[in-house]
Amino acid sequence: MKFGLNAIKAGCLKPHKRGVMVFLSLSGAVLAGGKGERMASQDKGLLLFRGEVMALSVGLALRQVTDCVFINANRNSERYADLGFEVIADDHFYQDKGPLSGLAACLTFAKTSHLLVSPCDTPCISGDAFTKLIFASNAFPDRIHYLSDAFGSHPLHAILPVEPALIILKDFLDKSERHSVMAFYEVFGCESVLWDKSEELLNVNTPDVLS
């Protein structure tokens, strides 16, 4: 079952208003715009893990909860497009600011009230994990929610209210010398969502993990 706008209309989620922010619709983005420095500059999202391209694994998990999924990538865009997703690059104005560059591009592109993001190098993530984020966001739609487990925070598995997050993020990037995802979240207002299946949060960002 998809937990986007159609699911809300069907009664699976009830639009919840807190202040002026309402959870109405959802898109998903695979973050694949990194430089892959710990992978000898390979494009991580296009590497195989257990026989499947990692960005595809993440994209298919996102498609379990929303039909509107795209990929943020700054190279090999045609190869990413061959996976069956629309591909967007970072805005040149916000380049070289780490994962926040990708977040800015995705928030700018999204046409929904909320955006789910997930990094390309966590190919074991499930739609169930995203569903838990969605329900947290439906209860408090004006906050950023991100996954955490017993080992710490996973801020790039997150759901964000698109319009207000983009406004605050641009201001944050213009004024701050810290390009920390958590620092931005704390400025905006955030909550962690516990996910107890730590194996799904495996970060495949070094050759030894890939093998």
Spans of model-derived segments:
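Nucleotide and nucleotide-moiety/phosphate-recognizing core
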Residues: 22-178, 186-200, 208
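Acidic two-metal-ion nuclease catalytic site recognized across multiple nuclease folds
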Residues: 211
